[in-house]
Amino acid sequence: MTGVQTCALPISLPNELDKNRASGPVWNGFLAAQVVLGPRVLFGIGTVAQLLLPASSGTKKAYDKHHIFPSNFLKGGPYDYARDRRANFACVDYQKNIYISDDDPKVYVAKYRAALGDAAYRTSYEENALPYGFEDMDYLKFLRQRRVLMSRW
């Protein structure tokens, strides 16, 4: 490859997604990619872009940053320290976040899979950078795989 210089910089985007809190430039970059590419929110029909629009009235946002493995589900367990990792968040509409509550992912995913059907369920996974079958994964394995999928957006 003539004229092309290479650099030994580490690939750091997946590592940046390992930090706590769904905020900052890396999280905002992920959201921006979702806005531009147009996927639907997790298990929903509205797009991320639609839910991020400023509300015409009222004080409640149309979307929530949902803990995929709910915070209270992880609280007090061996992964309590990692419950707010960026890779553990997805945009959901406000009502779905209330419905999911603090349920084990195995419980709430089964409900949405039955309601959506297999094709829409798989699409929702892909559009939200979720490893297929995450609800059956060890939490740390889920975080590792999701960081890689998110960094591809």
Show the residue positions of the predicted features.
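Intrinsically disordered, low-complexity N-proximal targeting/linker segments that flank membranes
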Residues: 1, 5-66, 73
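Short acidic (Asp/Glu) and glycine-rich catalytic loops that position anionic groups and cofactors
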Residues: 5, 10-11, 69, 87-90, ...
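C-terminal, well-folded lobe of enzymatic/effector domains
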Residues: 6, 117-153
